[in-house]
């Protein structure tokens, strides 16, 4: 009897111990959750994705940007710059959507008036574009905010110094943090390892990333992007005797996104054969311009335009740029010597990013071309998995918003006082960019 009694008592003790262990585990879990929650900062930082096509502006911790503005600048054609005489109700310079209106002459290259092509100084026009967006469109006082901006995957000290002048000296932000754009779209997916395929307005990059750190030795790039495709569209529409103004660039981008399709398996001769019955039957693509004009998008422009990314020689046989698939495979190949398991992680986490990747059929084409990819001394081996998020056109901004909402990010800001003490020459040394 005593043995039975002791056995029951022992079981009760085991239950009590188990309950206390469970309670302790739950308490530890709750503490961990609270730690994670406190990791997010209640202070809002301004987040700006400086895109070639569109500038996205919003606040850290939010899901979407407050403003997505075409990176356009225009001058009033009726305004006499020399004598500064113009209609009292008209502006001399306008930006964003307003720059697409017919009375203005749009400068297509607004973004490149800043760091990239003009390393010595930030242009007056680009500064005014940002002032208009921040102060007039969003009603913000820049001196009240720290700002987070993205920089090119290729770190350039001239650009970093130019951003210091632009955001701290000229715009008066109280702090500046710069994040390498290569990692941002990956963070937006919740991953830390993978290959980013960034298809931007003027460049295409492929960058392998391991545990959040870009492997720059394996970065590949091509001077081909969305702008080139848009220009092909423009040429095709002009062939159809439709007049296009410089300010219609925003509309042309919309035409590209809504009518351009990427064949999963491309055959150049097949798509150019005017007598091909399958092609003739293919649905005609129409698009309504803002002035109500209906335009027919030529098949050559609609289908061959996107091929520029996969084979730049289709439109210009003198181009020496590699196509997108070779860029991706080449980046993975450069990391193969590190670790075979790492290679598998990269192949199974290929993340598409950028507005140009939004074209119909784009993810399927990338997967189809990579599947079974081999060259003379490289075999992809594993089946590629393509991550094509529905909001990948704003993936960089989302990544910055997520990172900027963490309280630990605060230490990465270069404060205005520190900048003034150190000077612009040392900003590249002290800026913590990842």
Language-model regions, residue ranges each:
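Glycine-rich phosphate-binding loops at beta-strand->alpha-helix junctions
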Residues: 150-160, 264, 347-369, 392
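Acidic, glycine/GT-rich loop-and beta-edge segments that sit at the periphery of enzyme/chaperone cores
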Residues: 245-257, 264-274, 280, 379, ...
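Phosphate-binding glycine-rich/basic clefts of nucleotide- and phosphate-handling proteins
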Residues: 210, 214-318
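A short acidic Gly-Thr/Ser loop motif
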Residues: 40-41, 47-54, 189-191, 196-205, ...
């Amino acid at each position: 009897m005593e043995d039975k009694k002791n056995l029951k008592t022992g079981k009760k003790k085991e239950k009590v111990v188990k309950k206390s262990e469970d309670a302790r585990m739950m308490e530890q879990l709750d503490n961990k959750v609270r730690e994670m929650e406190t990791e997010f900062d209640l202070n809002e930082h301004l987040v700006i994705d400086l895109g070639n096509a569109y500038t996205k502006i919003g606040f850290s911790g939010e899901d979407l940007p407050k403003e997505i503005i075409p990176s356009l600048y225009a001058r009033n054609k009726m305004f006499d710059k020399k004598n500064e005489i113009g209609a009292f109700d008209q502006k001399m310079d306008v930006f964003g959507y307003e720059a697409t209106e017919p009375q203005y002459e749009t400068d297509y290259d607004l973004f490149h008036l800043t760091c990239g092509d003009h390393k010595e100084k930030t242009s007056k026009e680009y500064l005014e574009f940002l002032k208009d967006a921040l102060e007039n469109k969003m009603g913000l006082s820049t001196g009240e905010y720290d700002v987070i901006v993205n920089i090119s995957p290729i770190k350039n000290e001239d650009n970093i110094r130019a951003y210091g002048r632009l955001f701290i000296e000229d715009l008066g932000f109280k702090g500046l943090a710069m994040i390498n754009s290569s990692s941002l779209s990956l963070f937006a997916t919740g991953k830390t390892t993978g290959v980013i395929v960034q298809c931007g307005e003027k460049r295409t990059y492929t960058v392998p990333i391991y545990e959040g750190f870009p492997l720059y030795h394996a970065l590949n790039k091509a001077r081909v992007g969305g702008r080139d495709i848009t220009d092909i569209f423009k040429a095709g529409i002009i062939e159809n005797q439709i007049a296009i103004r410089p300010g219609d660039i925003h509309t042309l981008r919309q035409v590209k996104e809504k009518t351009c399709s990427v064949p999963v398996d491309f055959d150049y001769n097949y798509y150019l054969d005017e007598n091909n019955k399958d092609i003739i039957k293919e649905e005609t693509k129409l698009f309504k311009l803002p002035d109500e004009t209906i335009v027919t998008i030529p098949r050559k422009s609609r289908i061959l335009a996107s091929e520029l990314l996969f084979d730049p020689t289709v439109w210009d046989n003198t181009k020496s740029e590699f196509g997108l698939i070779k860029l991706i495979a080449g980046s993975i190949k450069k990391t193969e010597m590190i670790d075979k398991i790492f290679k598998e992680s990269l192949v199974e986490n290929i993340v598409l990013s950028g507005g140009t990747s939004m074209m119909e059929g784009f993810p399927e084409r990338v997967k189809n071309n990579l599947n079974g990819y081999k060259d003379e001394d490289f075999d992809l081996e594993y089946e590629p998995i393509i991550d094509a998020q529905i909001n990948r056109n704003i993936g960089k901004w989302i990544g910055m918003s997520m990172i900027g909402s963490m309280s630990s990010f605060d230490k990465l800001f270069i404060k205005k006082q520190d900048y003034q003490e150190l000077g612009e020459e040392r900003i590249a040394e002290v800026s913590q960019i990842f």
